[in-house]
Every structure is written in structure tokens, then in C-alpha cells.
Swiss-Prot record:
EC number of this enzyme: 6.1.1.20
Residues annotated as domain FDX-ACB: 701-794
Gene (UniProt): pheT
Disulfide bonds: none
Limits of the tRNA-binding domain: 39-148
NCBIfam families membership: pheT_bact, YtpR
Organism of this sequence: Shewanella oneidensis (strain ATCC 700550 / JCM 31522 / CIP 106686 / LMG 19005 / NCIMB 14063 / MR-1)
Protein name: Phenylalanine--tRNA ligase beta subunit
Pfam family, one: FDX-ACB
Primary location: cytoplasm
Keyword Magnesium: yes
Reaction(s) catalysed (UniProt annotation): tRNA(Phe) + L-phenylalanine + ATP = L-phenylalanyl-tRNA(Phe) + AMP + diphosphate + H(+)
Source species, domain of life: Bacteria
């Protein structure tokens, strides 16, 4: 909703600045989106009249004029505007004037002819009006008057973002009421002479859907001059409300729309056949609208029709056939109340959204129609002339909405606000809002206003009291509450620690949708059944995720397409696996997923550029596992997964139970997800990760540690993890450290075999180990490896 400050102040003029007024409106819940000047800064521009206008002797497109600005001397001005002509009232920038952009007007010669000023267009003065040529002012504009003063250009356009419940403020009358209430000032509505019918011309109105249209008014106005000029004051008020001037009849209906928030429509009376009918479409009728588009009218859509055809979509859009044109002489003014539910959604279904439907969907005042049709008729008579007939009304009192009756309790008011507002203030606020208030014992019986469709329950009234009383006048009081420490098992690893570790290792947390593209998910989990949403946001978001892979891979592709070469993401969330044995038929599991791609490190002169591989992400996962005291319970095992590379995939196990997978993305998935380069992922069950054991404090041994390196040759199929696990088991008493520092295949090692170089660190907490003891431990390790894996020491 746009409106000019000056127009608002015609209704109510509080003694506050523009900034304070905007702040008041915002704090009242009508958020001010912007305040813009109606014109750029300029000075020295006055109203003049072109007394003489002739062609320039040396330029076909220039005109030499003599202009009067009310003084005894005429001013010579050379002008290039095509609409410059004798007798025209114009905007004259005098010598010394400063126009927008710090453009100063000086005496000059154009093609040899003197020019002592400039005839201005709207754009040259920073006024947003589409117009060819110079400004054309009304013939009664007073010569010599400052243009800023005449057009009231020291004004601002205020744009308010209204919520759907405040339809009463979709007109100047509602905004003025709000400002008046906030400043304890009375609202001065415009005054006009009531219209007395001067002709008996009228139409018969037949409302067949009274629940959808409880009130319909029609009035004939004969012999109107549709070619009359819309007054400049009306054009300016419409422009500052974001509406361009079209013709006087349309301008008048738009003007009362902005003034009172009540949509109207005008029909060409000569195009009507028989009675006016308000009925539903039959599902087969078509209508060409005022914008030239043709629509088929659904059977549940309300229309205005005559005996021959539909004339308009009720409350939405007028029809082209019956619209006012240059040849119109007699018009029928329509002013109606349409029930919000009768209009709601109809315009959007047809791809339309109009100022009328916007208001009717939210609700207009059902008691406003008589006043508005009289206001519009008076404006038509004053601007276009003509003779007005009587107002014809079709009304269903039973279907007209009634003001809500709401009981407001003092106890409920105090409880919700947490602050005592005196009884006198409560009554004053509600009455200033136009409500009727009757005091009871510890309560008030309130009858709301007809224009407040959003008043239905007690909390609505409490909000109004708080809003007008002022949120800033309600002190901040800390709630009284008993604090209790939350339960936390020491055997549980907190998710916060896991998140912090991943962030410290260069990851960023992603939050993806729980519903994913079923086509992409089928590539990741072929043949697995997923939950399908009955009403998805879109077809690409219609399946619940079976793992974190789909969302994370989509996020990687999104980032890579935006020049992000190095991507490291993690996400925690639920996966949804159909399970007939689970509650509601779905098993929800909390999961942790990570993905990396691109270089290991950000580009740096002292670092070699190297692409991430399987072991980079495995190292990150082992760092997470290291947060638990139960790291020895975790292991990895070569496996296969439909989404992972068959040669670079492993299961993640805890106590020999599979809790997740890690590996490189299968090459067949790179193109569908838009992946560029090797991508490594893992996913595991959070519950299996976060449960740990209490740490046991141990003294640090003061005796020296001893390192022994062994190189064992095993089959290529033997997992290094299994080898390390066996060594740890055999040497658990004295072996304090195991490190695989080399894997070798090639010369000196038989085909099908590999060499594992392992560092063994031995230490005792009570004494220094002797060489014999160390040798025995190493020998027991080698012997166990030989027995289990047919391993041999490499020479």
C-alpha cells in the first residue's frame, strides 16, 4: 500500500515529523517499507505560459518561444519539445535555477537564438511520470507560482507492507484511523455534497448468490463526458499511490479504491442487455477481460452478468465488452460487498491478481458501500458532468457479516501482557479503535467494528491493547523460573563436541532438506523403497531421504557449479526408512554424514597441491572416533555399496556391527549430481557413535619406551586394519603404540602380496623392559601374524 504523506495529513495531521510518523506506523504493526520523495531536489522553477511559439530559423526540431511568468517582460526560450505550443501552461526553469544533478540554468544561445531559461519535462525535474515532451499544466495554473508549491512536491511517498489480517488499512480511511488512534486525534473525512437523483434511469439487480454477495449497489449516470480531463490533484494522488491515470471514469474508481479501500467498477450502460445478475459461472462461459486476455469461467466462480453474457469476474476483473470506452455516454456504477470466501483463490486460479481481489479476499467494510458510491457519483458529476439516477440496492441482511462480540477478561489480559494496563486505558484504546465497550465484573464485553475482519477471539483484543498502549511502554521483566540442571550421562559423547571437531578440521555444517529428488535417490539407493510425500513442494522434493548422501552430494554439486573447488561439508539429521515394525511404519535414525572434494588444503605457496583421497576422510572419521574412550571398538571392513566405488568402499563397524559406510562416490553418480573430481563420503549412525565409556585415569610411565619396526608380507586381500587389530590384541600388556608407516607392492615382493611396515612401541609402567622381553613380544606378534594371515617377515 502506497500513499502520500500530504494526503494522509489531509485526513489526520499529528504534530510529528515524517520520521516519527513512519516509526509510529511501524510500531503499530503496519511495517513501513520505504519513504521516498515524490520529486528530486530543484529550485527556481515557476509556472509560465507560452505566449508565442514559432519554428527556429536554423533547426527544424527547435521552437522559439516567448514565455510569460506573470511579470511585464516576456522571456525568450528555445525549446525542442514536440508538444510546445501557444497558450500552454508550462514549468519554466528561470536563469539561476538549479535542477536535479546540480544542473544550473544559464543564459545561452541555441543555433544563434537567445534562450533565457528552460521549459521542463517531468523527468528533468526527477518526477516519475511517463510523459513525452514538456509538462502541461492546467489552464488555471497561476503564473509565477513556484512549481514545488503548486504541485506540493515537498511530499513523500510512504509504502506500508500490510499483513493479510489488516485489510482495513488498504485505504486512506483505515490508515488515517490508525494514525488518529495512535496520536489521540480525530479523523477529518472528506466532505462532499450528497447526490440527489436528477433522472429516473436505473437497472434491476438480481442477486442469485446472496451468501457470496450480500450487498450489491448500482447507479446509472447518464450523459457523462468520458473525454474530460482528470484533475491534476487527482492524477497526483493516484501517481503517489502507484497508480497511473487512464481516463476520468477509471481514475475516479481507482481514487475511491485508495481513499476508502472499496473496489468499484463502471459499465457502459449501452452494452448491457436486461437485468444485472450476480450468479455463478456455468463452467463453459468465456470472457475477454479488460487486459485483452480470454478466460474460461469455472463453475464455482462468481460473475456479474446481464441477460446475454457475463460482464465481469465479480470482485476480480471487468470484461472488455462492457468496459467504458471513448464512445461511452451512459455508465452504470457498481459498488458491492463480496464475501471473502467467495473471492479467495479465484483470481490466482485464473492467473490474475488485482487490487480489487486483493481487498475482497481480505475483507472490506460491509457498511461502506452507500458512502463510496455517493462519493464516486459526486466526483463523476463534478469532473464529467451528467445526470445521476437513484441507487438500486440488492441486500441480504442475513448474509451480511456481523461485528464480533468478544469477552475480554482482566485476568487474561494481565497474564498475556505480564503488565497491568489501567481499566481506563483499556476502555479508551478499544473505543478509539471504533469498538463498543461495556464494563463488567472483571471483564469487558466488546463489540468490534465492521471493518475489522481480524477480530475474532480474546487474544485479538489483547493484541490491540498492547499495540496501541505501546510495546515500549511494557517493561521488560525476567520470568520467574526454577532452574534445574539437565541430565547428561558421562558415558555419552555430546554432538556439540563432534560438530566443533569437524569445524576445527575445516568442515562447514550443511542443512539440507529431509525430502529429496526421488530420481537422484534411486541412483544412490537403487531398488530401495522410500516414503513418498502426498503433497510435496515440488516433484524434485517428493521423497523422504534414506541417507544423508543424496542431500550432501546435491550440495557439493551446487557449490562446485559456483566456483567452489574445495568443499568440506558435514550434516546431522534424520533418515527415514520404511519399516512395518516401527511406529507409524517408518524408522527414523539420527545420522552423521560428511563429504569432501577438491584439494586437501587451500592454495598456498608452501604447500603441494594434492587432491583428497579415501584416507583423508578416513583420518577425519578416526579423529571423531578418537573423541570416544572406546576407539578400539571401531573397525573398518572392505565392502560394497551401490553409491560407492567398488574398490574404495568400507563398512564402519562397532563391536562388529555395521553402523555406516565410507568410500569414494561411484563414477556413475558424478554426472547426475554435477560432481567435478573425486568425491569421498561417509555416513554413520549417531547413536552408535555417541555412546562411549568413562575414561580411566592412568599415570604416565616414567620408564623409557622402546620402538621396534617390522615389515611383514601378507596377501593383498588381507586388510591392514585386521593386521593392526591382531597385533593390538597379542601385545596388549606392553604394546602402547602401533603405527602403520608404509605399504609397499612391487620389486622384491611377490605378485599378489604386499609389505606392511609397522612400528611397535613397547613400554612398562613399573620397570624398564629388557631386550629379551621386547624380543619375546615382537616374536609373539610375528608368530600370531603367521598363524592368522600366513604372514612372513620381509628380508
Amino acid at each position: 500500500m502506497k500513499f502520500s504523506e500530504s494526503w494522509l495529513r489531509e485526513w489526520v495531521n499529528p504534530a510529528v515529523s515524517r520520521e516519527a510518523l513512519s516509526h509510529q506506523i511501524t510500531m503499530a504493526g503496519l511495517e513501513v517499507d520505504g519513504v521516498d520523495a515524490v520529486a528530486a531536489e530543484f529550485n527556481g522553477v515557476v509556472i509560465g505560459e507560452v505566449v508565442e511559439c514559432g519554428l527556429h530559423p536554423d533547426a527544424d526540431k527547435l521552437r522559439v518561444t516567448k514565455v510569460s511568468v506573470g511579470s511585464s517582460e516576456l522571456i525568450d526560450i528555445v525549446c525542442g519539445a514536440p508538444n510546445c505550443r501557444q497558450g500552454l501552461k508550462v514549468a519554466v526553469a528561470m536563469v539561476g535555477a538549479v535542477l536535479p544533478g546540480d544542473f544550473k540554468i544559464k543564459k545561452a544561445k541555441l543555433r544563434g537564438m537567445p534562450s533565457e531559461g528552460m521549459l521542463c519535462s517531468y523527468s528533468e525535474l526527477g518526477i516519475d511520470i511517463d510523459s513525452d515532451g514538456i509538462i502541461e499544466l492546467p489552464l488555471d495554473a497561476p503564473l509565477g507560482t513556484d512549481l514545488r508549491e503548486y504541485l506540493k512536491l515537498d511530499d513523500a511517498v510512504i509504502e506500508v507492507d500490510l499483513t493479510a489480517n489488516r485489510a482495513d488499512c488498504l485505504g486512506m480511511v483505515g490508515l488515517a484511523r490508525e494514525v488518529g488512534v495512535l496520536n489521540r486525534q480525530a479523523v477529518t473525512e472528506p466532505q462532499w455534497q450528497a447526490v440527489t437523483p436528477t433522472t429516473d434511469a436505473k437497472v434491476t439487480i438480481n442477486v442469485k448468490e446472496s451468501a457470496a454477495c450480500p450487498r450489491y449497489l448500482g447507479r446509472v449516470v447518464k450523459n457523462v463526458n468520458v473525454k474530460a480531463a482528470t484533475p491534476l490533484w487527482m492524477q497526483e494522488k493516484l501517481r503517489r499511490s502507484g497508480i497511473r491515470s487512464i481516463d476520468p471514469i477509471v481514475d475516479i474508481t481507482n481514487f475511491v479504491l485508495v481513499e476508502f479501500g472499496q473496489p468499484m467498477h463502471a459499465f457502459d450502460l449501452a452494452k448491457l442487455t436486461g437485468d444485472i445478475q450476480v450468479r455463478l459461472g456455468n463452467g463453459e462461459e468465456k470472457i475477454t477481460l479488460l487486459d485483452g486476455s480470454e478466460v474460461t469461467i469455472p463453475s464455482d466462480t462468481l460473475v456479474i452478468a446481464d441477460d446475454a453474457r457475463p460482464l465481469a469476474l465479480a470482485g476480480v476483473f471487468g470484461g472488455e465488452y462492457s468496459g467504458v470506452s471513448d464512445t461511452t455516454q451512459d455508465i452504470l456504477l457498481e459498488c458491492a460487498f463480496f464475501a471473502p470466501l467467495a473471492i479467495m483463490g479465484k483470481s490466482r486460479r485464473l492467473g490474475l491478481h488485482t487490487d480489487s481481489s486483493h481487498r475482497f479476499e481480505r475483507g472490506v467494510d460491509p457498511e461502506m458501500q452507500h458512502k463510496v458510491i455517493d462519493r464516486a457519483t459526486r466526483l463523476v458529476l463534478d469532473i464529467c458532468g451528467g445526470e445521476a439516477g437513484p441507487v438500486v440496492e440488492a441486500k441480504s441482511d442475513a448474509d451480511l457479516p456481523k461485528p464480533a462480540q468478544i469477552l475480554l477478561r482482566r485476568s487474561k489480559l494481565d497474564k498475556i501482557l505480564g503488565h497491568y494496563v489501567p481499566d481506563s486505558d483499556v476502555v479508551e484504546i478499544l473505543e478509539r479503535l471504533g469498538f463498543s465497550v461495556v464494563k463488567g465484573e472483571g471483564c469487558w464485553q466488546v463489540i468490534t467494528a465492521t471493518y475489522r475482519f481480524d477480530m475474532a477471539i480474546e487474544e485479538d483484543l489483547i493484541e490491540e491493547v498492547a499495540r496501541i498502549y505501546g510495546y515500549n511502554n511494557i517493561p521488560n521483566v525476567a520470568p520467574i523460573a526454577s532452574l534445574r540442571m539437565s541430565d547428561h550421562k558421562e558415558t555419552d559423547l555430546s554432538l556439540k563436541r563432534v560438530r566443533s571437531l569437524l569445524v576445527a578440521r575445516g568442515f562447514q555444517e550443511a542443512v539440507t532438506y529431509s525430502f529429496v529428488d526421488p530420481k537422484l535417490q534411486n541412483l544412490v539407493h537403487p531398488g530401495e523403497q522410500a516414503m513418498v510425500l502426498p503433497n510435496p513442494i515440488s516433484s524434485e522434493m517428493s521423497a523422504m531421504r534414506l541417507s544423508m548422501f543424496t542431500g550432501l552430494l546435491t550440495a557439493v554439486g551446487y557449490n562446485q557449479s559456483r566456483q567452489q573447488g574445495r568443499v568440506r561439508l558435514f550434516e546431522t539429521g534424520l533418515r527415514f526408512v520404511p519399516d512395518i515394525n516401527a511406529e507409524s511404519g517408518v524408522r527414523q535414525q539420527a545420522m552423521l554424514g560428511c563429504v569432501i572434494t577438491g584439494p586437501q588444503n587451500d592454495e598456498h605457496w608452501a604447500m603441494e597441491s594434492k587432491t583428497v583421497d579415501f584416507f583423508d576422510l578416513k583420518g577425519d572419521l578416526e579423529a571423531i572416533i578418537g573423541l570416544t574412550v572406546s576407539a578400539s571398538e571401531f573397525s573398518f571392513r572392505v565392502a560394497t555399496h551401490s553409491a560407492l566405488h567398488p574398490g574404495q568402499c568400507a563398512e564402519i563397524l562397532r563391536n562388529d556391527r555395521v553402523i555406516g559406510h565410507i568410500g569414494a562416490i561411484h563414477p556413475s553418480l558424478e554426472k547426475p549430481f554435477g560432481l567435478n573430481g573425486k568425491t569421498i563420503v561417509f555416513e554413520l549412525e549417531l547413536d552408535a557413535l555417541l555412546h562411549t565409556s568413562l575414561p580411566l585415569a592412568q599415570a604416565v610411565s616414567k620408564f623409557p619406551a622402546n620402538r621396534r619396526d617390522i615389515a611383514v608380507v601378507v596377501d593383498e586381500s588381507v586388510s591392514a586394519g585386521d593386521v593392526m587389530k591382531l597385533i593390538r590384541k597379542v601385545g596388549e600388556n606392553q604394546l602402547v603404540g602401533i603405527n602403520l608407516f608404509d605399504v609397499y607392492l612391487g620389486k622384491g615382493v611377490e605378485p599378489g602380496k604386499k609389505s606392511l611396515a609397522i612400528a611397535l612401541t613397547l613400554q612398562d609402567t613399573t620397570r624398564t623392559l629388557e631386550e629379551k622381553e621386547i624380543a619375546e613380544t615382537v616374536e609373539s606378534v610375528v608368530s600370531a601374524l603367521k598363524t592368522e594371515f600366513n604372514a612372513s617377515l620381509r628380508d
